[in-house]
Amino acid sequence: MDHVYSFSEAKRFPPYKSVLTFEADACPLVPNWHRELSRAWDELAAPKDVKMFGARVEHPLPHINGNAMFSGDLKFLYWISRLIGGCDPTQGWDFRLARDFKREGWMDCPLIKSHWQKKTMSPDEIHSLRSSGVVLLHGVKDDSVIADTRKRFVG
């Protein structure tokens, strides 16, 4: 976020409507996943001035998982990168900052799902998520999701 803020503020980046952050255990489920997320931002998040748009999880307390889209608004980017800057390393940053993100404006994104420490996922489970409209999945620790996605869409 700091990189995006610095380059946006210096006008070395064009204005971004949002920034997607995701970890190595996140996997797109459909070919045009980034377009689908962009459309969802435009239709659901932007009209409500949402700053964090991702999978709502309930454990250990309600929060939006950090594999999410964040507003490209310069004031928000300044807040998250310069005023917040970091947090207690004994907790996940998304959970630790949940109250702050809620105050800034968060929303569950129905196209992103997150699982906590899920070891594997069956093809039927993956198909069910795809069928329900999920385009980005986070939290499966083995290669079952990426292998299924490659098999379906890469060949």
Model-assigned labels for residue ranges:
Residues 14-27:
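Short beta-strand-to-loop acidic/aromatic patch adjacent to the donor-nucleotide binding site
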